[in-house]
Amino acid sequence: MANEGAGSLQQDASPGSSARPEPYPRPSPARYASTPSFESPQRHHRRNPIARRPVKETLNARSEYTLSQDDGTADDRINQYVIKQEIGRGSFGAVHVAVDQYGNEYAVKEFSKARLRKRAKSQLLRQSRGPKRSSRWPKLPFSSPGTGTWRRRDEKCSLFYQRRNCHYEEVTPQQSSILDRGTGRPDPRFSYMVMEMCKKGVVMKVTLEERADPYDDERCRCWFRDLILGIEYLHAQGIVHRDIKPDNCLITNDDVLKVVDFGVSEMFVLNSDMFTAKSAGSPAFLPPELCVVKHGDVSGKAADIWSMGVTLYCLRYGKLPFEEHSIIELYDAIKNRPIVCDGETDEVFKDLMLRILEKDPAKRIQMDELREHPWVTKNGMDPLLPKSENTAEIVDLPTEEEMFSAITKNFGHVLAVMKAAKKFKSLQGPTRASTPIQSILGQEYETHFVEPPTQMDPEESVSLPSPLPYKKTQSLNTYNRRAWERDDVVKGYHPQRRKLSLVLRQRAANRVLRTALF
């Protein structure tokens, strides 16, 4: 009977069978980006175009405290956003949940400008004196030659670049606006960045003192593929993140991993080696080449790949690969201790970890090899989208006007100071009277001046038209003056005005520098 049933099924499936055909073809199985599963989401195979959202910048935003309609408590409101509870805190400020007038939730990141200026000054004092590197940024006045990284313009340029250029699925884009709030002074105390809200928070909370529950193999692979695509895109833009860790990987409501926090990132010339001499980031995620004193220039790309490997280790095992409570012991373990995968039975994953966490940066796996590794692609059965498609959208450089807007906050103040400096400079020039110029001897000369005698009697005086009568005697008296002072008097220079002009010009130049740099 079983054979007869099988034969009937085969007969029904034959081309000549009289079975009724299906009126519509069956739909192909759909892939969803909401749940990591054995089948990778569509974003790993095809890049959906992301529309560029215009970023609104508001200077001197309106701030007020209002009574909540729910419980009567006071709410802090900035423009249309009501600031709610704090969800995180960093070195420059806190991150709060904000709700707009339509009930949409956003993440508002607060930046203390005082801390930004303090850090910019400290970086200026520690500025390296190594060989100069070409800079990708347009040259701006009041700044020293570039070294390929952000020096004096680090803080505001980094905020400016993030809010203008991060339009990518695995990199958190700026969602709404930039707000400056102060106390009515020209220089506000805080800046706020309104960004997309990743409601599921950080991918994992793991520290030297805290462990977490590890994720299964499929979730680790899915989110690590997101991380590969995001960091590959940043490297194509000439950006090295330098602080990749689980705390800086957020999960959206539809389970997309997004890279955040570019506070210590560096930007280089496109298609360069991206070598840096700075040490930045979390100690437990630093590569071995940065755990030594006077390490010199190291590859920023290789450092990011090491941090990606440590992040993957945390996701898979719920702990850090090197756990030491002393910084010196931690650095020694990172440099010398081999990586241990406790209880790992997957030899392919173990091979991946050994290649990512290679002590020698020259032998460490590179991004092109990493995206093709058998564990990442399931032995070639689930490849990532091509690199050319992932990095197709290279962002244009910001214009000088946009850079000035990001650095000076309001360039009108700089223009006003420059106009004032130009006016002070004009005061140094000789003041010509409307009537023919007379020498101190009383004779009229239209084309040249006459050198005064070496000595003159104090009683001698000449009446000349002057806009400042009370300065007349002092201006025209050449008695007991040095030779160059007598020349200035004859040519129309006022000694006190000359000195005052120099002082005012120097003060104006200092104000221009302070406004442009800090």
Swiss-Prot record:
This is Calcium/calmodulin-dependent protein kinase kinase cmkC. Activated by Ca(2+)/calmodulin. Binding of calmodulin may relieve intrasteric autoinhibition. Gene3D superfamilies: Phosphorylase Kinase, domain 1, Transferase(Phosphotransferase) domain 1. It catalyses: L-seryl-[protein] + ATP = O-phospho-L-seryl-[protein] + ADP + H(+); L-threonyl-[protein] + ATP = O-phospho-L-threonyl-[protein] + ADP + H(+). The autoinhibitory domain overlaps with the calmodulin binding region and may be involved in intrasteric autoinhibition. Keywords: ATP-binding, Calmodulin-binding, Cell cycle, Cell division, Kinase, Nucleotide-binding, Serine/threonine-protein kinase, Transferase. Disruption phenotype: Not lethal, but spores germinate with delayed kinetics and this lag corresponds to a delay in the G1-phase activation of the cyclin-dependent kinase nimX. Does not activate cmkB. The keyword ATP-binding applies. Residues 8-17, 60-71 have a biased composition (Polar residues). The lineage of its organism: Eukaryota, Fungi, Dikarya, Ascomycota, Pezizomycotina. ATP binds at I87, G88, R89, G90, S91, F92, G93, A94, V95, K109. It holds the Pfam family Pkinase. Residues 81-376 form the Protein kinase domain. GO terms for cellular component: cytoplasm. The gene is cmkC. The keyword Kinase applies. Calcium/calmodulin-dependent protein kinase that operates in the calcium-triggered CaMKK-CaMK1 signaling cascade. Phosphorylates and activates cmkB in vitro. Required in G1-phase of the cell cycle for proper timing of the initial nuclear division after germination as well as for subsequent nuclear division cycles. Required for the normal temporal regulation of nimX activity. The active site is at D243 (proton acceptor). Its EC number is 2.7.11.17. Belongs to the protein kinase superfamily. Ser/Thr protein kinase family.
